Design a protein with these regions (language model features):
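Short, structured surface patches at the beginning of a domain
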Residues: 1-126
């Protein structure tokens, strides 16, 4: 059983699932995996491009650097982290550096990690 936090982001355009839909997906996923929920972070009506302009996500990042209260951050969908692949890969890289991971009902950690590594290899060839 892993100690987990969950993150919810909504935005004003209505592209992402609602807060209630995200919470239901995250809680169902955590229960299915046997995870122990210990924290949550939210950014309501937050744009999806810049990671560091969101207080909830900044708090989660601070936790992985300083407090180490949890091992896994669960999101309903990968785009709840960011609308851009590069920002998502940056976040996955940061989690991997600190021994944490990102999980979603739509995508396991191994896929996030493999995609991030492929992206970083492609960027290093430029």
């Amino acid at each position: 059983m892993a100690l987990v936090a969950y993150y919810i982001r909504t935005e004003t355009e209505g592209i992402l699932p609602t807060k209630d839909e995200q919470m239901a997906a995250v809680l169902a996923y955590a229960a299915e995996k046997g995870h122990d929920l210990v924290a949550h972070y939210e950014d309501i009506d937050a744009p999806g491009l810049l990671l560091y302009h969101r207080p909830g996500l900044k708090e989660a990042i601070n936790n992985i650097k300083e407090l180490e209260d949890w091992e896994v951050l669960v999101v309903a969908e990968p785009r709840c982290i960011s609308d851009t692949e590069s920002a998502l890969h940056e976040f996955v890289h940061k989690l991997s550096l600190y021994g944490n991971r990102l999980e979603s009902p739509a995508r396991p950690w191994e896929d996030f990690l493999a995609d991030m590594r492929s992206y970083r290899r492609a960027m290093s060839r430029r």
